[in-house]
């Protein structure tokens, strides 16, 4: 771990340099490929890892090789992963989905911003130096129209977004021919439907049933379509955002790009500090992945941080502000009801959700029902006009394993199920947020309860952390729970970084959290038996057995760390072709010994086979030519 501490000025300057010099970058020995759909502008990005050939025989002067197929993998990095694309953060990303949105002809540009706060910010010329220059003119649904992917799915329409997703979820596995790579253990899927080939119609069907969501605000055309549902690959969310204490716009944009590079399928901007509006605009215009927020955080800032002063009007204005910027999903803590708050009194750690505690305090101060619950239908009307998905927040999630699976937690969950049905009346897409802190033996019940109470809407959990004793290592404690609940059917895992419970994560913390959670998500896909999930593992194992070190590095989730660890003890180029590593050395390498055993067994089999043929030759009289039997 680095011991160098940068000043705030140095951190900001470093982030600014990152942004100014940003260009598309591929991982080592990887290249960006695009798979085209039924129309020319459906170009689905993937990363293809190129592999070296296997030595199969021959001589030193004339070696014989067998080619190894390139391995295609899911890629969340957008244009930042393509060296051929010119990157300019000041201009933002290309508007990939704009032609599809326009072609549907069910939305219209607004003459002015609907949010009074947005109009106030735009009128403040003191913010000109902070403001993103290429602001979009926001759109909303035409009168009487709904523009959500759920609405289209229910109408039987397969959108370009759905076709894009079908291609993306298949991960190019149809390109793989090797039986060794295609081999896969049967999984235990706990009732999930995992077709061998995902079609656009299957995507449409899952969205129509509410089992999956496509977060895709019509005001975020830069995003590449993705899907969240238990019958698809398990996804990972990364949280970024400034606070009143630290971080800047430059640093948050840097963290966004960094997150997508290391595999974030979505990113939540949880900013609570200065310039929340401006920071979010920069993030959205440069994000190839869906962006989520917790609007109550900004609404609280608008009333000077005093929860009791929150009003529906201030919150509604915040929803309009963020929807017209392009936020793809809102976390709404509408299930924290007044009657549930006393249930938390006997907890060890009370209410640990920021949004949950804000709403609980408001309810108790006014002795009124949660205004988010009371105005939930109006929230749905706003979301339906922009296609903002709802992530129904678990404001009463347990903050310690002692509080896991208690009355407050599951009471709120049942209310979220009721709210899910209301949202579906408005064709609004919904996912459900989950815990939290839960010991391993109590995790599966969370998934079972969610499926039953929330009608199979996608589950999105923070971990859960399986023990409370490891501050500084909570990416590990939660990664265990994340792998388990992903296996049981959780659709998206919210990452936890090493800084959880300790401080705001920096760039390296973001990477550590993402790598941990990509491992958890992939382990869950393997356990479920998701078709094609084992291809990369098989390729890695084959490279490992054949001592193809470069391929091992390049197939790793983090090639740079894998290479660095190897090179700590064997830095020479000869170490990249050696048939051992520093763990066992040349004499005790189990794989080298296994290769010898295999070669010996093969030679023995040939020798036994030759002996059998010799015996058979003698038994038939030892004649070189046998007489043909007469008919």
UniProtKB/Swiss-Prot annotation:
Binding site for Zn(2+): 437, 501
Disulfide bridge partners, by residue number: none
Keywords: 4Fe-4S, Iron, Iron-sulfur, Lyase, Metal-binding, S-adenosyl-L-methionine, Thiamine biosynthesis, Zinc
Superkingdom, taxonomy of origin: Bacteria
Catalytic reaction(s) noted: 5-amino-1-(5-phospho-beta-D-ribosyl)imidazole + S-adenosyl-L-methionine = 4-amino-2-methyl-5-(phosphooxymethyl)pyrimidine + CO + 5'-deoxyadenosine + formate + L-methionine + 3 H(+)
Cofactor(s) needed for function: [4Fe-4S] cluster
Its job: Catalyzes the synthesis of the hydroxymethylpyrimidine phosphate (HMP-P) moiety of thiamine from aminoimidazole ribotide (AIR) in a radical S-adenosyl-L-methionine (SAM)-dependent reaction.
Pathway stated in the Swiss-Prot or TrEMBL entry: Cofactor biosynthesis; thiamine diphosphate biosynthesis
Quaternary context: Homodimer.
One BP term from GO: thiamine biosynthetic process
Binding site for substrate: 239, 268, 297, 333, 353-355, 394-397, 433, 460
Keyword tRNA processing assigned: no
Name the record gives this protein: Phosphomethylpyrimidine synthase
InterPro entries: ThiC, ThiC-associated_dom, ThiC/Bza_core_dom, ThiC/BzaA/B
Annotated organism of origin: Salmonella dublin (strain CT_02021853)
EC number(s) on file: 4.1.99.17
Presence of keyword Zinc: yes
Binding, [4Fe-4S] cluster: 581, 584, 589
């Amino acid at each position: 771990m680095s011991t160098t501490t940068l000043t705030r000025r140095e951190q900001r300057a470093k982030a600014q340099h990152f942004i100014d010099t940003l260009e598309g970058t591929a991982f080592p020995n990887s290249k960006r490929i695009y798979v085209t759909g039924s129309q020319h502008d459906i170009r689905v990005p993937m990363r293809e890892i190129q592999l070296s050939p296997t030595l199969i025989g021959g001589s030193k002067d004339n070696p014989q090789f067998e080619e190894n197929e390139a391995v295609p993998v899911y890629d969340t990095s957008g244009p930042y992963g393509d060296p051929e694309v010119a990157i300019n953060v000041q201009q933002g990303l290309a508007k990939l989905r704009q032609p599809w949105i326009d072609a549907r002809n069910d939305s219209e540009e607004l003459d002015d911003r609907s949010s009074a706060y947005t109009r106030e910010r735009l009128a403040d010329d003191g913010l000109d130096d902070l403001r993103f220059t290429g602001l979009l003119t926001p759109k909303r649904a035409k009168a009487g129209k709904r523009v959500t992917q759920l609405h289209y799915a229910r109408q039987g329409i397969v959108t370009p977004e759905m076709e894009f997703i079908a291609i993306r979820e298949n991960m190019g596995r149809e390109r793989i021919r090797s039986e060794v790579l295609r081999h896969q253990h049967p999984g235990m899927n706990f009732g999930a439907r995992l077709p061998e080939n995902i079609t656009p119609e299957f995507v449409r069907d899952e969205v129509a049933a509410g089992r999956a969501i496509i977060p895709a605000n019509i005001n975020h055309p830069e995003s590449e379509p993705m899907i969240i549902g238990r019958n698809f690959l398990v996804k990972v969310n990364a949280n970024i955002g400034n606070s009143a204490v630290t971080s800047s716009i430059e640093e948050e944009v840097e963290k966004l790009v960094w997150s997508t590079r290391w595999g974030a399928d979505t990113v939540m901007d949880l900013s609570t500090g200065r310039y929340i509006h401006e920071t979010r605009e920069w993030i959205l215009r440069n994000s190839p992945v869906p962006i989520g927020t917790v609007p109550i955080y900004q609404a609280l800032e608008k009333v000077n941080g005093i929860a009791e002063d929150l009003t529906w009007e201030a919150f509604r204005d915040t929803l309009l502000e963020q929807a017209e910027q392009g936020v793809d999903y809102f976390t709404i803590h509408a299930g924290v009801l007044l009657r549930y708050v006393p249930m938390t009194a006997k907890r060890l750690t009370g209410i640990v959700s920021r949004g949950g505690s804000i709403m609980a305090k408001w309810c108790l101060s006014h002795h009124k029902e949660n205004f988010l619950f009371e105005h939930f239908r109006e929230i749905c009307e706003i979301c339906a006009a922009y296609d903002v998905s709802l992530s129904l927040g678990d404001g009463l999630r347990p903050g310690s394993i002692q509080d896991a699976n208690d009355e407050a937690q599951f009471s709120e969950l049942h209310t979220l199920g009721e709210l899910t049905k209301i949202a579906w009346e408005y064709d609004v897409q919904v996912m459900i947020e989950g815990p939290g802190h839960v010991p391993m033996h109590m995790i599966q019940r969370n998934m079972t309860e969610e499926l039953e109470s929330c009608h199979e809407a996608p589950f999105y959990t923070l971990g859960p952390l399986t023990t409370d004793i490891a501050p500084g290592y909570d990416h590990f404690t939660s990664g265990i729970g994340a792998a388990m609940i992903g296996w049981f059917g959780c659709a998206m895992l919210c990452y936890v970084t090493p800084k959880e419970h300790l401080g705001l994560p920096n760039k390296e913390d973001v990477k550590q959290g993402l790598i941990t959670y990509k491992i958890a998500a992939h382990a869950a896909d393997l356990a479920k038996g998701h078709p094609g999930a084992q291809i990369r593992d098989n390729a890695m194992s084959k490279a490992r057995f054949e001592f193809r070190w470069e391929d091992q590095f390049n197939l790793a989730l983090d090639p740079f760390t894998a290479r660095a660890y190897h090179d700590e003890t064997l830095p020479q180029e000869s170490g990249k072709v050696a048939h051992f590593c520093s763990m066992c050395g040349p004499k005790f390498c189990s794989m080298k010994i296994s290769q010898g055993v295999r070669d010996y067994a093969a030679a023995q089999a040939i020798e036994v086979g030759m002996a059998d043929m010799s015996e058979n030759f003698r038994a038939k009289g030892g004649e070189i030519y046998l007489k043909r039997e007469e008919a």
